[in-house]
């Protein structure tokens, strides 16, 4: 809700913006306008509703285990592409924290074009990220590959990353939307901005 100060008086009122999700083509806007509690009725033209300034004009601030993302302060996520061993990830975590990073990222599961390439340390990589978090206090960010991993990620990861390859893995996005863990959604390799925002609607 947004506070509004009346120009005719010193009273401060609250304005509540309500959004209707789904097919609104049959709604009669005039029926809504006649309600004395309604100031204005307008249609959101874009297909994305939740990820839309018309529904929440205020800036979003996401709390990731005490670190705020959004608002006036810049949050920096830094770390290695792949978690390789404890010495590497703890050392990098300490270095990026010293350089001003506020979150630690590292790949435990690595999607590769070739089945013969390094696929990441997987569950062991998650354990090493947790050690680095304990050593530095930095919340951890890592990529999830499928909904089968969700329970472990919800338990251990502070910010779940959805990679470009999974931006349109809609079943995974739906499952993530049912959790209370923040999600970092990367834009797909050839996705438009609208497709990216529509993927965010699932979350």
Where are these regions (language model features)?
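Glycine-enriched alpha-helix->loop->beta-strand junction motifs that scaffold or abut catalytic
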Residues: 100, 152-161, 177-183
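Single conserved hydrophobic/aromatic residue that forms the stacking wall/gate
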Residues: 2-9, 13
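Conserved anion-binding
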Residues: 108-112, 166-203
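Active-site mouth loops of central-metabolism enzymes
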Residues: 74-89, 115-119, 141-143, 164
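Catalytic beta/alpha-barrel core
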Residues: 121, 138-146, 158-169, 182-193
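N-terminal amphipathic alpha-helix/helix-capping segment at the start of soluble metabolic enzymes
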Residues: 46-77
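Alpha-helix-loop-beta-strand connector modules within alpha/beta enzyme cores
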Residues: 119-141, 176-182
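Glycine-rich, proline-tolerant flexible connector loops at the mouths of alpha/beta enzymes
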Residues: 105-123
